[in-house]
Each structure stands twice: as C-alpha cells, then as structure tokens.
C-alpha cells in the first residue's frame, strides 16, 4: 500500500468520525430540546408552573420554592390519537395580559381585574396546550385544530401530591348527582381506588400555609370532570360517557340505558374546558377569587339590557305548596 493511499484512508476515517460525532451531537440537541422544561410565572413572580416534555407532558405547580403538585400528567385521546403522548413541539409563544372585565351581572365585583402571563405550546398533530399563570392560581386547556367532527375518548388529568394532604370533597354514588352530598374530609394517602369518586370543586389543605381549590371553567359541549383515587397519594380524572338511549326514571329525570364509547362528540376546531388551580395563602383569597369568570367564554350577547338580577322562588324548596282546591292563586304567596 502506498503512502498516499494510506493517508487517504486515514483522512476518510477521521472525516467519518467527525461526521458521526456531529450527527450524535445534533441528535442529543434535538433530544434536549424535546425534553426542555418550559416555565411560566405569575405576574408577581410567586407562582410557577414548570412544564416538562419527554415521552409525555408533565408539570409541577410551585409557590416560590414549595412544590404543591408534582409530575402531574395531562393527555387528550381524540379518535386514535393520543394528544400529549410523545409530543413534538413546533412553536412556543408567550404574552402578558392586564385588563379589566365588566360582568353583565356583578356577583362579587362590578369590575374584575384579569392579569396573567400566558404560555402557548403548539405541537405536531394539530393541537396546542395553553397555560395561564395568575397571581392567585394557574390554569391550562387543550386546543385542537382538526377538520370536521371528532370523538374525544378520554381526557387524562393526573394530580400527584408530594405529601399527605387533607381533601375536602363531595362523593356522589355515581355520575348522576344533584351536587348536594355532604362534604367529607379525606387524607390523600388513605384514599383508596375502591372508594367513591369525587366531584368539583375540590378544596385541598396542604397542611402548611397553602390551600388549593380545583375546578373548571368554559364547559361547552363537554362533560363535567370527576376524580378517582389512584391509590398512591394521587388522583386522576374520570368522565361520564355520552348517553345514547334513555328510559323513564321518575318525574324529573331520565335513566341512561346505553352509552357511547366516547365522552364527547364535538367540533374539531375548538378550545376545551379550562382546568384551574386557585392557590391561596389565606382563606380570604378563596372567597375573593373570580377564576371561573375570568376563564369563561366572553359574553356574545350584544344587548344585555334586559337581564336584571332579582329573587327566585321554588315552591317545592321553600314549602309554599300552592296546590289544591283551597288555593285561588291570588297575588302573593299562598
């Protein structure tokens, strides 16, 4: 073998090694980008939600340096697609909002301050997840941009507690509920998978200086959210499926005799309900919060002058019982 031939082969070997190294480095960078943590802070800097992307989407909720919820998972199953599994991030956008909202009918306030920071993560597969951080809580929702009508088979919202929390909850016997069950007080690490599910809202006492109120907003063409225990100091979402056939069940309700395999059949271009967490350091903040209103769909009525607040009376509830031969229905409460 000539000296020139040997030198050429050696040069090619070196080039191949360099190319392999560059390719490996490029793949490593891609993996690091795919697993990058995205952080969103509240305007006052106290609240943080840290979103981690790997083979799934998980997030932590923190107040200053205290972890309140950890490695919480989210996913939406649409048809045969798992939105949130092996996510491929395509775009990240941020913005800050500082506005005032004016309710048509004031409940707590005539003017509601709506100040938050927003993070929008767009993924391959025609979906996005929007996060918002307020000074008194955090929220997120799925957004899809799909053609036609879609079937939502399930939505996963898994919450993991870093310590034993005290849960103040209502436990219905099933999805058919009047939301009138008495509140129970459950140790999160003692809540078993065989125990009844719970409905919203859920109030959590971390046993430190924080309380967490969990609920939802902007429910349109979608079922209400319930939770079941995972048995390991965590809980996951559970939803009623779409009813297909009904039967008689008393004078004011229907019995579901057949269910679909999906929880919603809905428009493919839409935003889904907000899942929100009010974080309070004192109980006053729980009463003062307006998160449901702030996250609700904006009013679409052009004329609201006809809407007036007033009193309502339900004779079955207050015992007026204006029935029978002796009732002549004159003005007033008979």
List where the protein language model places each region.
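Generic detector of bulky aromatic hydrophobic side chains
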Residues: 8, 13, 43, 142, ...
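Bacterial Sec-dependent N-terminal signal peptides
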Residues: 1-37
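An acidic-aromatic substrate-binding cleft motif
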Residues: 267-333
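N-terminal accessory beta-strand-rich subdomains and adjacent acidic, glycine-rich linkers
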Residues: 39-292, 299
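Generic detection of intrinsically disordered/low-complexity segments and helix-coil linkers/edges
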Residues: 3-5, 20, 27, 53, ...
